[in-house]
Amino acid sequence: MRVYVVGGAVRDRLLGLPVQDHDWVVVGATPDEMLARGFRAVGKDFPVFLHPRTGEEYALARTERKSGRGYTGFTVHASPDVTLEEDLRRRDLTINAMAQDEDGTLIDPYGGRRDLENRVFRHVSEAFAEDPVRVLRVARFAARFEGFSVAGETLALMRTMVDDGEVDHLVAERVWQELARGLMETRPSRMFAVLRECCALARILPEVDRLFGVPQPPQHHPEVDTGIHVMAVVDHAAATAQPLAVRWACLLHDLGKADTPVHVLPHHYGHEAKSADRARAVSERLKAPLECRDLAVLLAREHGILHQARALRPVTIVKLLERTDALRRPERFGLLLEAAACDFHGRPGMAERPYVQAAIWQAALAAVRSVDAGAIARSCTDKASIPQRVHEARVAAVKARHAEEKD
């Protein structure tokens, strides 16, 4: 029985990155031997055990053979005669197909260290094509590891997988899981660039893919291309350490621009409502968490008016605060403003400029929240008029705040 640490832990150690988790492979052992040593069996599809002291996962060396479409169609073979090299061969990329023994000796049968030094993502074998999730994983790694590129032969294989319809068999939950993880990396735009390169973005997120090449008014968007703008917005959200809901909202906020008639371009009148509808549809199709869906819909619908804060009448400001439920959910409204700021900053030359609109909206919200709706309700004899009376008091409070600021 021989034990090796494999995969990401070895890769990250060679890159000088912190190692968060260890994955272990056990060669030459049976399930009964693992149980006899105090390990606890947890694997359903293949033999995986938890260490009795550390709780880390130890998997018996195994091979996998494709037996159906999608990422679940595999036949697994795990036995004491499976070698370490055979186990490593089933892995996706050479940089993830390295191992270290208990003495720290590197086992690298597929050139992973060389590819790390050259900053290349390269598939280990043609078995890469058997699991369509790997297309998303490679794209996600591109968002994490700065300066890496996809080997030409690997990109060609990914395109073939897309053409063969393998990506179409991915379930929504798995697509969301990989997209969400990629959005939380340091440069999410690289994930979408790789997905575009292999033509997978058009299958997974066609609504985003359609944004590339759609022009915007250059006086407001020097980058012109809507797709480029959206990528800059998402990257700014990552650079400012925004949570997933904000990053997802940033990705979807301009989807309606792809529907603008050609004769209207580069203007996009009323694109916010279309964007909101598409943001909801995409979020529901991929089964995104409700907080991600709802913030995406809000940003898509409201980002245009949020940017106009300095020119709005108090009544317009109050209406937005009411329809976004900002009074009951101020934390979510704060996230909405963070996302709007990312949209503002996602243009050339704007990254360092302050988004003053956020302070205007927060001040207005504070003024509206100072209104005692309960007192108004108690003093009102006509109960049907209570909502209107409260609304009018809120507008008056915002007017008063504006007057104070001018003074």
From Swiss-Prot:
EC numbers: 2.7.7.72, 3.1.3.-, 3.1.4.-
SUPFAM superfamilies registered for this protein in UniProt: Nucleotidyltransferase, Poly A polymerase C-terminal region-like
Annotated residues for binding of Mg(2+): 21, 23
CC cofactor note: Magnesium is required for nucleotidyltransferase activity.
CC cofactor: Mg(2+); Ni(2+)
Disulfide bonds: none
Reaction equations catalysed: a tRNA precursor + 2 CTP + ATP = a tRNA with a 3' CCA end + 3 diphosphate; a tRNA with a 3' CCA end + 2 CTP + ATP = a tRNA with a 3' CCACCA end + 3 diphosphate
UniProt entry keywords in alphabetical sequence: ATP-binding, Hydrolase, Magnesium, Metal-binding, Multifunctional enzyme, Nickel, Nucleotide-binding, Nucleotidyltransferase, RNA repair, RNA-binding, Transferase, tRNA processing
Residues covered by the HD domain: 226-327
Pfam families: HD, PolyA_pol, PolyA_pol_RNAbd
GO terms classed as biological process: RNA repair; tRNA 3'-terminal CCA addition
Single GO term (MF): phosphatase activity
Binding residue positions for CTP: 8, 11, 91, 137, 140
Binding positions (ATP): 8, 11, 91, 137, 140
Family: Belongs to the tRNA nucleotidyltransferase/poly(A) polymerase family. Bacterial CCA-adding enzyme type 1 subfamily.
PANTHER family: MULTIFUNCTIONAL CCA PROTEIN (PTHR47545:SF1)
Note: A single active site specifically recognizes both ATP and CTP and is responsible for their addition.
Domain comment as written in the entry: Comprises two domains: an N-terminal domain containing the nucleotidyltransferase activity and a C-terminal HD domain associated with both phosphodiesterase and phosphatase activities.
Protein task: Catalyzes the addition and repair of the essential 3'-terminal CCA sequence in tRNAs without using a nucleic acid template. Adds these three nucleotides in the order of C, C, and A to the tRNA nucleotide-73, using CTP and ATP as substrates and producing inorganic pyrophosphate. tRNA 3'-terminal CCA addition is required both for tRNA processing and repair. Also involved in tRNA surveillance by mediating tandem CCA addition to generate a CCACCA at the 3' terminus of unstable tRNAs. While stable tRNAs receive only 3'-terminal CCA, unstable tRNAs are marked with CCACCA and rapidly degraded.
Quaternary assembly: Monomer. Can also form homodimers and oligomers.
Stated name of the protein: Multifunctional CCA protein
Organism listed in the record: Aromatoleum aromaticum (strain DSM 19018 / LMG 30748 / EbN1)
Gene behind this protein: cca
